[in-house]
């Protein structure tokens, strides 16, 4: 089994903020597959099982995401872990993939690294930098950014669908990496 985790913060206060990119992308995927999440108190997360994937949205707040991830990883004895998360160091419109490496200051990844190691796959969604890191990641996308954000989230969702069918991270990486911001028609 593979654990597929979307990072974000719970509660309406943080809904659709830049830091909740992982939640939003997983929500879109689950909706398109006509599935739904159910809350698991055991893992303090919303879970959805599809094929041999466990889709997880931790409800611990970002800085403690590793607690939910470790709990689900151990319970389901998953072999692979893929984290979908926002990335300040990438411009909006860019999607990159990697295995392992540093956390880039991302507190959700720090928590996962501490409790689970850093040897996992990542789908990184660029959210650009702003003035004041905390304020920026907890802000919603500007109206003029919405079309690009929507297109990029759709692209990331399609990458996950491909991965679920192929189980091939390298093929997903080769097919769906966006090194430059996605170009959309106005």
Swiss-Prot record:
NCBIfam families in UniProt: pth
Annotated protein name in UniProt: Peptidyl-tRNA hydrolase
Family of this protein: Belongs to the PTH family.
GO biological process terms, semicolon-separated: protein quality control for misfolded or incompletely synthesized proteins; rescue of stalled ribosome
Function text: Hydrolyzes ribosome-free peptidyl-tRNAs (with 1 or more amino acids incorporated), which drop off the ribosome during protein synthesis, or as a result of ribosome stalling.
Gene: pth
MF terms in GO: peptidyl-tRNA hydrolase activity; tRNA binding
Reactions this protein catalyses: an N-acyl-L-alpha-aminoacyl-tRNA + H2O = an N-acyl-L-amino acid + a tRNA + H(+)
First-level EC class: hydrolase
Predominant subcellular localization, coarse grouping: cytoplasm
InterPro entries: Pept_tRNA_hydro, Pept_tRNA_hydro_CS, Pept_tRNA_hydro_sf
Alphabetized UniProt keyword annotations: Cytoplasm, Hydrolase, RNA-binding, tRNA-binding
A Pfam family that the UniProt record links to this protein: Pept_tRNA_hydro
Protein residues bound to tRNA: 14, 61, 63, 107
Recorded GO CC terms: cytoplasm
């Amino acid at each position: 089994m593979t654990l597929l985790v979307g990072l974000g913060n719970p509660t309406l206060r943080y809904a659709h903020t830049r830091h909740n990119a992982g939640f939003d992308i997983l929500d879109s995927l689950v909706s398109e597959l006509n599935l739904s999440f159910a809350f698991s108190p055991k893992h303090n997360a919303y879970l959805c099982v599809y094929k041999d994937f466990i889709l997880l949205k931790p409800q611990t707040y970002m800085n403690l995401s590793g607690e939910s991830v470790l709990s689900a990883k151990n319970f389901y004895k998953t072999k692979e872990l893929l984290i979908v998360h926002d990335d300040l160091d990438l411009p909006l419109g860019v999607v990159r993939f990697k295995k392992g490496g540093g956390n880039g200051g991302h507190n959700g990844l720090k928590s996962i690294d501490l409790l689970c190691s850093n040897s996992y796959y990542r789908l990184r969604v660029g959210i650009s930098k702003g003035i004041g890191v905390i304020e920026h990641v907890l802000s919603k996308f500007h109206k003029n950014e919405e079309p690009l954000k929507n297109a990029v989230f759709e692209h990331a969702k399609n990458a996950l669908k491909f991965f679920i069918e192929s189980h091939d991270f390298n093929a997903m990486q080769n097919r769906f990496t966006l090194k430059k911001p996605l170009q959309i028609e106005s």
